[in-house]
């Protein structure tokens, strides 16, 4: 699986992210590193993955609901296919947990 052209830089980024989360500075760091459009793209990918893992809607419906392109949905779907199933189970649990928390906060 392709991760990065420069693994040393990628690992430095991951280390910085870990430190930011440990110290409660993840919001500031991601705001510094990502443009508003990039942050929106990451948030959209989370929504796409969540919808795809839920399996209650067709990809075309997800595309329409999230107002995005078929190619964007396909990229999310393709990544799900190449990730280890155990990891995807974990992601699904996290997304389901987050959705339950959001529903309970109304």
Curated annotation (Swiss-Prot):
Where does this chain mainly localize? Answer: cytoplasm
Q: How does it assemble?
A: Homodimer.
Any Gene Ontology biological process? negative regulation of DNA-templated transcription
Task: Give the protein's recorded name.
Answer: Trp operon repressor homolog
Q: A GO CC term?
A: cytoplasm
Q: Which residues bind DNA?
A: 59-82
Q: Which Gene3D superfamilies match?
A: TrpR-like
Keyword DNA-binding in annotation: yes
Its biological function? This protein is an aporepressor. When complexed with L-tryptophan it binds the operator region of the trp operon and prevents the initiation of transcription.
To which protein family does this belong?
Answer: Belongs to the TrpR family.
Q: Source species, please?
A: Histophilus somni (strain 129Pt) (Haemophilus somnus)
Q: Where is the signal peptide?
A: none
Q: Which UniProt keywords apply?
A: Cytoplasm, DNA-binding, Repressor, Transcription, Transcription regulation
GO MF terms on file?
Answer: DNA-binding transcription factor activity; sequence-specific DNA binding
Tell me the classification of the organism that encodes this protein.
Bacteria, Pseudomonadati, Pseudomonadota, Gammaproteobacteria, Pasteurellales
What are the subcellular locations of this protein? Cytoplasm
